[in-house]
Amino acid sequence: ATLLFLIGIKYIITEDAMGGLSRMEVTELMADSYDEEVEVPVGEKMTLMLVDGTKIVANSRTIVRYPKRFDGDCREVYVKGEAYFDVAHDAEHPFLVHSDNFRVKVLGTRFNVNNYDTSDSQVVLVQGSVELKTTNNDRVRMKPNEMVNLQEGGFAEKRLVNTDEYTCWMQGMISLTGESVESVTQRLSHYYGVTILPDDKI
């Protein structure tokens, strides 16, 4: 459940209730449940340590919203952009990462989320296990070294990957192995916040 605090009154919105809301409405409601918001400057990275011991490394232009403390049955945060999560284990309080087009549910694990573009998002699992739920109500369970592609609010693909290629941005590198020119320019555009167009001659 997502806890919303408005004028000192606690409201509980269940998953079923949220399922009937639009993507924009869900995002607006969830924004009210977080005390803190950070937006990483262009070209920089930021490390956040949450009160439960969870570590978040956020990439350039990423927005992260989180509470000062976790009071409910679940630990919930919101992310828009790209972030790596090292979640502190707590079997009684699952950790939920919300975005505009999917949700990741974990107990304790390490994974990378990339949703700069909500029409084409990725989740890469480094360690542990997670369950994804999309705005289309698709559910996908992941194992380590798997990547899930999400398109237009639904599940598109799951495959094995080298997770280092998707987390090396934390060391200031970008892996472009096997990517098309269009994919490369899109990633650089997201990172720097500018429009980069490929040369037709390439």
What are these regions (language model features)?
Residues L3-I202:
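A residue-level detector for the "anchor" residue at the start of short, highly conserved motifs
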